[in-house]
Amino acid sequence: NEDLFQYNTKVSVPFVISNKNYGILWDSYSYCRWGNPEDYLQLNRAFKLYDKDGKEGQLTGTYVDKNGQKIVRGEDSIYFEYAMPEASEICNKTDNGGIQNLPKGFALNGSKVVYEGYVEAPTNSFYQFILYYAGYMKIYIDGKLVVPERWRTAWNPNSYKFETPIKKGVKTPIRIEWQPDGDVSYCGLRVAAPRSEAEKNQLSIWSEMSPDMDYYFIAGQNLDEVISGYRTLTGKASLYPKWTLGFWQSRERYQSSKDIEDNMKKFRDLHIPVDNIVQDWNYWKLDSWGSHEFEAARYPNPQAMLDSVHAMNGRFMISVWPKFYDTVKNYKELDSKGWMYHQAIKDDIHDWLGFRGSFYDAYSDGARKMFWRQMDENLYTKYKFGIDAWWMDASEPNVRDCTPMWYRKALSGPTALGTSTEYFNAYSIVNADAIYNGQRSVNPNQRVFLLTRSGFAGEQRYSTATWSGDIATRWEDMRAQMTAGLNYSMAG
């Protein structure tokens, strides 16, 4: 079972490939579910719950802060998966869930939380759970450690699916151990309703909003022919520049042109092969996100920096977001045409640096052309085509972390094509279109290369590579990237 939506560390392409030499491309841009078309249930909707003393109705939640102060209360569900901006009128009117339902006044940082008791299942089954977590988590069911310790940073929680057998009519012990990460943290545990073997062996597809229920069946003699058919439908993959196959040097983050040049020279002095050095975010003035301008105090001569990198036989990639602070000139120019999303401004959302901004509407052809022109005037043509590649960060788009699905759609719409519900998953491809066709329009003899944090069917035609986002620094997350990368690469 899989939910198809875009988020930091999650890329969703509505294409499935079979070892029987066929593929199915689902023609929908919206949030989808593959496998089980029903959403996961809160624990009290799937099971009878009992507290740790055996009383029916709810689990026991025990919260102990770093000073040893304890709160014990009943929990009929474990669903603390999101936060809402305090100034948002629509949030305050329509959604009182998420971390607002944690104990009032309880300090999460340094605390330990345990949810425990018993679940009684309505039928014998292997139950599929989905865990949402930030901080350290362990789960025991029927006395067995079914989820060994996992960790995620609080600003970017993770989901983890697991399956375990539970017998009908038996009070089965459950224990969830959570050590939150930071002052604000998240956790949740839900479960899918059991399905028959026949249902499990069928492909069910659910789409939240599509004008038609269309899909393409792609047959072939082998998997290569299936991928070829997929590319016939969605676009041929562009040829990357040769240097992209070499080693890239990136970090969070180089903070000056001197940093860039010194590190590139050090690699050369040590005879360590490197083909590409990457400038991550915040090369602009602190309050000027979206200006696409190097801060002069730290980057006094960007052209000389680029020339130096090229003289050392290196390439230069730079991060550009579809995000703009509402005080910068580029925001105002886009906004004057109606090409900025306004909900984040209306709700007075400030980012982690303390400034307010939003994302542009890449579904508008005019907005895409203006977005590229702003990049070109401030970065590309301005520096004699010296930028070799573009890192398109947050291209889901991820306007704000850790919000519920309905509010994410409110933040990223309405689009020029229609409601963000219908076009929820396709932002990265139209954003890639802006840069690919923009660069080709001013410099058709140079190959384009884009690194993007999100992807969709057809992304390959814009010479994109996709990375899996801000994963955790844990071995289990590193291992997951291997299968995730193989899985993603099967989509053309």
Question: What do the PLM-derived regions correspond to, one by one?
Answer:
Residues 1-60, 65-94, 98-115, 136, ...:
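Catalytic-domain carbohydrate-binding cleft regions of carbohydrate-active enzymes
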Residues 119-139, 174:
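Aromatic-lined ligand-binding clefts that engage carbohydrates, nucleic acids, or primary amines
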